[in-house]
Regions:
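Acidic, low-complexity terminal tails and accessory targeting/binding regions
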Residues: 1-3, 19, 37-47, 78, ...
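Active-site-proximal alpha-helix that buttresses catalytic centers in soluble enzyme cores
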Residues: 2-77
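Generic beta-sheet signal
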Residues: 3, 52, 141-151
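Cofactor-binding loop segments of dinucleotide-utilizing enzymes, especially the Rossmann-like FAD-
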Residues: 8, 82, 150
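Short, active-site-adjacent cap segments at secondary-structure transitions
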Residues: 12, 62-63, 85-86, 153-155
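Phosphate-handling substructures
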Residues: 15-33, 72-130
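Active-site catalytic microenvironments for nucleophilic, acid-base chemistry
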Residues: 68-72, 138, 160-163
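A short, acidic, amphipathic alpha-helical segment used as a generic capping/interface helix at domain edges
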Residues: 127-141
């Protein structure tokens, strides 16, 4: 199965951060309107034309990106809970942006070095990859799908990425 992996557009977390919302509440943040034109342009690429379905994270930023893409194509759209973001706090409470970033950098450094992850406060790459693969296996009947999700989901599938994947960008790979 060919996968066109699209990282969601640029989110606007300003209100969520201003109100010290929990991670769950932050996931309702919409896309930043200042970047919508750029996202629309990126999603007009002909590579999407022969896909058969869109499989999407349930987070608002991914859903809004998938909706923009789907407006052009009218593909069947599947929303999958397990394509969600990496969990910075497995307990599900509020953690500061600084602490979330610290955990993210630690997570990525361990991923880069291929070292075991032992901090139980955040989700490990093996768990993230397992839940993502379980979702994708259900869509094997398709030859080509678009997955709209998050950078850490892409990295769980493709390994550590030195250059990252900018919001709204996409990569194609075979599963």
């Amino acid at each position: 199965m060919d996968i066109i992996f699209v990282r969601h557009g640029v989110p606007d977390f300003s209100l969520a951060d201003e109100r010290c919302m929990t991670q769950l509440e932050k996931d309702y943040a919409p896309l930043d309107r200042a970047y919508l034109s750029e996202l629309h342009q990126k999603l007009t690429n002909a590579v999407f034309d022969d896909a058969q379905a869109i499989i999407c994270s349930p987070y608002t930023r991914a859903l809004q990106t998938a909706e923009i893409l789907n407006r052009r194509h009218g593909f069947e759209l599947f929303v999958e809970h397990d394509l969600r973001e990496w969990r910075a706090d497995t307990a599900g409470g509020y953690i500061s942006l600084a602490e979330r970033d610290r955990r993210w950098h630690e997570y990525r450094e361990l991923l880069k070095l291929r070292l075991p992850m032992s901090d139980e406060r955040y989700e490990h790459v093996t768990a993230l990859k397992a839940r993502t693969m379980a979702v994708l296996e259900r869509y094997r009947q398709y030859d080509k799908v678009i997955v709209v999700s998050h950078f850490n989901v892409f990295e769980a599938l493709q390994g550590y990425q030195e250059q990252g994947l900018a919001c709204g960008d996409f990569k194609i790979f075979r599963l």
